[in-house]
Amino acid sequence: MVETSSLSQNEIDAMMKRIHSVPIIETLQMEILRLDEGECEGHVPRAKKWDGIYQTFHGGLLATIADTVTCWAILTKIGSEAKVATTDFNIRFLRPCNTDVRCVARVIKAG
């Protein structure tokens, strides 16, 4: 069950339909925990198959998770059927990731 405080059930259903149409969601076993206007929270379980060379979560996959959850946060503002693309992305890793991933995206400025 997806938590929300600002979206209608119809909006949640439309978002979840769009989310589950993207193959990376199933591939990474990503679960969407919360959708609110301009916000999304996702979870990806830790699995050895996602490791990089140091037996920690591969940085490229962490970036993919962040990019994906950010997309869903944006779509809560502009509509689940809107066409979007990442044009610029920057991430700084603070330490290795040896656990499940919880990712929270919040739209600061739309447009």
Regions found by a protein language model. Name each.
Residues 1-111:
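Terminal targeting signals and extreme-terminal segments of soluble enzymes
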